[in-house]
Amino acid sequence: MKLKNTILLLLLFSSIIIIIGCSKTVPKTPLEFQKELLAGTSAYLNTQRTWQLDSFYVDGINFPLTPLQKGYKKTFSYDGLYSDSEMNTGKWEIQTLGKLKQTIIYKTTNKQDSSVFDIVSINAARLNLNIKLSNGKLGSYSFKISN
């Protein structure tokens, strides 16, 4: 009886070790990881991220922000929807690593516009974007996490 219990216990223990040892966690691709840093993971209470404008540079020259500009926020939802603190809405997508495409519908005019930003850097607390402005200069936006 004692031998039978020992064998069953060993079998159970071995099965648990095999199950735990063989379970795999599939690593995220850099593209998936970048999307999750921007907009959340879709897990409970992590379905969107709000970013607040922190600084703005043109060709490396700092442009001091007004109080209104300091309050500007962009919200990216995990499902690809976009909104901002000026009540504009739209969509976002990252199809290529480091390239953020925003399609915005402006509330005041109901017109649609698209822009592609270079994602210079992104982490859980900061988002830095570059875009070529209409005058040919480089605009650099720095955002901090707001939510």
Language-model features: locations:
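Lipid interaction determinants
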Residues: 23-91, 97-147
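Hydrophobic helical h-region of N-terminal Sec-dependent signal peptides
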Residues: 8, 12-16
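Bacterial N-terminal signal peptides that target proteins for export
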Residues: 1-9
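C-terminal motif of bacterial Sec signal peptides marking the signal peptidase cleavage site
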Residues: 18-21
